[in-house]
Amino acid sequence: MKPLTSLLLSAALSAAAPHPASPQAPLADIPSIVGETRTEFSQNSLDDVVNASPLLSFHRDLVSIESISGNEGAAGAFVADFLASHNFTVIKQPVTTESDARFNIFAIPESQYHSLDESHSSHSPQILLTSHIDTVPPFIPYSLHRDANDTDDRNILIAGRGTVDAKGSVAAQIFAALDILAAQPSAPLGLLFVVGEETGGDGMKAFSQSTHLNPSPSRFHTVIFGEPTELALVAGHKGMLGFEVAAHGHAAHSGYPWLGESAISAILPALARVDQLGDIPVEEGGLPASDKYGRTTVNIGRMEGGVATNVVPSKARAGVAVRLAAGTHDEAREVVLKAVRDVTGGDDRVVVNFSLEGYGPQDLDTDVPGFNITTVNYGTDVPNLQLHPRPDGKVRRYLYGPGTIHVAHGDNEALTVAQLEEAVRGYKKLIQAALDRSAS
């Protein structure tokens, strides 16, 4: 999951009006749980719990495979083999034309494969469950932890890179689909597990561009995205705009700074102004806020400049991420450009480069009862999945999954057995609601 943004929120709570995503506070202190567990319970007893559960075993095996973005092949092959052994027809979609080492996994029940080319068929996949198999670095091995005073297996903590983001969602979605298909073999389900979500979404973009897998009109009336949402349904997430502010000057000896032009001195006023844009009212040139998402936030995440303290710096640059609470990314670009021009007096040594794609806030569906409702600040593959219109109306989009974003990219990434198991039930509830809609 792309960084920024509560642990287990009760899935039994009825739907409520969404609250702004910022600020959110963790609901449990996972670092202390991982760091302070003792060894009164043997590792064998913890392993026995996992070995006895197909869900937990699959999750363990997937997390144990390193799949940092760009190196997803082994994890993809594992998921593809598992699905094929459970009566799915699996399509490995290459993400680049240069190599087939990186691929998305698209799978449908074998009994329905003949209808894949029939986008209007009642047996073609109409409900899509999707998440991503890539993770951020570094790889952290799978491990199990239990509080010495807690004998409830549901509270066992499963730690490691990807346990939360997003291999927990991948595992729960697969086992939810298997449960549904066992009871309803003709359920029109499709599974899509993509690469590259953490680094720009090239996997989902490749799927979107496939006329075979993503035909027009769309065969899907429901898409269920898997990300760590603390088992809440997400009413939407903020938009995103990324850019670089750069400045150039002229190098000179720092003892005679008037002989040069400092790129850092030139860029500082621009960065100071950009850093405040989320706090400035729109009528005064700032970025917009909304009741649903709160205020737009700005993060200057990286800065570079100069070569030594005794040299007037000739170059400087900074990377900026804006989480948009309202408006479009095009409108936000204009706000940023005007702010930089105004504060620098139009200094042509300072430029803004919008090299990354952006998108506005993503509103999502929350019409299935029995879930807590929230909004989040982080980005997802939701805007990267571009489905074609359907003649019968819009496609419903849901965002749900186990675990919390607060640990998703940290060295304390972990979730509990209970959260993973509850996610299976939650995904089944979302699938069944979609099946009921299509039958009515």
Curated annotation (Swiss-Prot):
Catalytic residues, chain numbering: E197
Binding site residues for Zn(2+) 1: D165, E198
Glycosylation sites: N87, N149, N353, N372
Signal sequence residues: 1-16
Cellular compartments annotated: Secreted
Domain of life of the native organism: Eukaryota
Name the UniProt record assigns to this protein: Probable carboxypeptidase AFUA_6G06800
Species in which this protein is naturally found: Aspergillus fumigatus (strain ATCC MYA-4609 / CBS 101355 / FGSC A1100 / Af293)
Source lineage: Eukaryota, Fungi, Dikarya, Ascomycota, Pezizomycotina
